[in-house]
């Protein structure tokens, strides 16, 4: 647990929980949850809600505080490039301070603790909420661009050997976009409800930032839809190329089988137990050489015909 406070426009660490501070809980243990719950009269279940990866984005008005849960992107460990999932970020607003709860250390929150966000103050609670949502929306867009860049890299493999790992990675990218689309729509719903709640104090500057957040989230939703269509097209292209390569392989195998069968057919005819007088070139001392030459000529003509028909 870390406690921050803005003093003279500078973010500093605070000694205890009091008015105007930001309580940052990252993967809190039971003792930290109990301490915050007792001091601020907040239900422990609400503090632990964001620690459940299955928790959906929502906003809830409780007695004495407001609970906001949104989804943020996080990279999947030990997965390929561009493979992400979403996890909940909990924001609790009381009359005097703000609390954030997350199961992992994420740039959405850590950028504020590292003073990388301008115009940030722990005392401006609603502005802080909108800045968190804005940071999450821009992070979605950054990850979406990385996903599309990785898709383009996979497309370059089409000219060479297509590996099973490429198909699995493409499936992972598509799954990531499904998670993003679902989470962004849920975040957009939470944002719409925030604009209608009169209980949350709003300022004109906050409303301008809120408009920016709405624009960024909608843009992220549009980007997700576009990139999903792109990946769908890439997947269909992969499938078409694999089918085409299989068809070509079958054509080559069929052509080679035909060329191998011609000498077998001719030699089989001469190997039958029949009267030699009825077999061409049977009486010639050069009969074997003539038959071999004729066989080669037939195979050469057949190979030329197959090549003209793009079967060899």
Language-model regions, residue ranges each:
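Peripheral, non-transmembrane regulatory/ligand-interaction domains of membrane transport proteins
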Residues: 1-203, 209-212, 216-226, 311-312
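Hydrophobic alpha-helical transmembrane segments and their immediately adjacent juxtamembrane loops
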Residues: 41, 215-312
């Amino acid at each position: 647990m870390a406690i921050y406070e803005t003093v003279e426009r500078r973010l500093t660490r605070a000694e205890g929980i009091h008015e105007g501070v930001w309580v940052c809980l990252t993967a809190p243990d039971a003792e930290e949850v109990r301490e915050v719950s007792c001091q601020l009269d907040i239900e422990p279940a609400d503090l632990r809600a964001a620690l459940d990866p299955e928790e959906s984005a929502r906003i809830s008005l409780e007695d004495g505080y407001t609970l906001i849960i949104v989804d943020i992107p996080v990279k999947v460990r030990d997965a390929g490039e561009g493979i992400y999932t979403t996890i909940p970020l909990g924001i609790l607003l009381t009359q005097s301070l703000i609390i954030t709860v997350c199961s992992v250390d994420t740039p959405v929150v850590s950028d504020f603790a590292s003073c990388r966000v301008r115009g940030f103050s722990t005392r401006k609670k609603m502005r802080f909420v909108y800045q968190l949502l804005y940071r999450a929306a821009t992070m979605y867009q950054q990850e979406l661009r990385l996903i599309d860049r990785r898709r383009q890299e996979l497309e370059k493999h089409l000219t060479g050997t297509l590996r099973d790992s490429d198909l699995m990675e493409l499936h992972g990218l598509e799954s990531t976009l499904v998670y993003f689309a679902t989470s962004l729509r849920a975040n957009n719903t939470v944002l719409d409800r925030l604009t209608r709640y009169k209980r949350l104090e709003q300022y004109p500057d906050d409303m301008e930032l809120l408009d920016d957040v709405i624009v960024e989230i909608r843009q992220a939703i549009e980007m997700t839809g576009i990139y999903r269509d792109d990946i769908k097209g890439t997947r269909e292209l992969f499938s078409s190329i694999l089918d085409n390569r299989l068809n070509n392989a079958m054509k080559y195998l069929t052509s080679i089988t035909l060329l191998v069968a011609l000498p077998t057919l001719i030699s089989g005819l001469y190997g039958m137990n029949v009267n030699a007088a009825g077999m061409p070139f049977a009486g010639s001392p050069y009969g074997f050489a003539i038959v071999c030459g004729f066989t080669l000529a037939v195979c050469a003509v057949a190979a030329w015909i197959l090549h003209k028909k793009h079967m060899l």
